[in-house]
């Protein structure tokens, strides 16, 4: 297994995953929270626009005054500013909290694995709790495969991974092929810009369908209302 940074490993240990229970590892942005629409509103208020021409941020953010495309460091700076100001204010995806609550009652342990800046970890936890999703949060850096593999190894049973990013599905399948990967993008306009990655085991389009596929992958009888 790939060596994990000490800070990430400490968070994984603190997540409290128990052996012998089914595990759900969920991304936050575009799975639990409506990130892209909120980010676009944020940058438009500050003199930028979003092209919606591809499934990526870099290359799609332009300065409204002259149409200049922002490069990766500039987009990263906008993201840092966005999360510093709005991490607690991003609206939840409809149906996510209710579905997770039903899965938790059925015995599923849930961990939120997010690549939000480390400085906003507490804000993300607060936002999740306020929106009835009080689950452990692990702030990851880079590909999520090593962290997901660690969590699944600790659980020792069926595990499901949900993420909007194709690269993370590739990373997880490489690190832990036994994890069921479900590709989910909450914002329909963004979802149209990306195909299901070949490593993903499913591509549900809404939370009722996603809940049913999670339950089926974990061998449960609940799911999907």
Please give the residue ranges for each predicted region.
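Active-site neighborhood of HAD-like aspartate-dependent phosphohydrolases
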Residues: 1-72
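Glycine-rich phosphate-binding loop signature in dinucleotide/nucleotide-binding domains
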Residues: 18-19, 106-108, 152-158
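Short acidic-hydrophobic, aromatic-tinged amphipathic segments that line or gate anion-handling sites
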Residues: 136-142, 199-209
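Metal-dependent phosphoesterase signature
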Residues: 62-95
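Substrate-recognition "cap/lid" segment bordering the active-site pocket of phosphatases
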Residues: 117-160, 166-175
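Acidic, Mg2+-coordinating phosphoryl-transfer loop and its flanking beta/alpha structural elements
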Residues: 161-205
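Short, charged, surface-exposed secondary-structure boundary motifs
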Residues: 146-149, 190-198, 213-215
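Substrate-recognition element of Asp-dependent hydrolases with the DxDx(T/V) motif
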Residues: 87-92, 96-127, 137-139
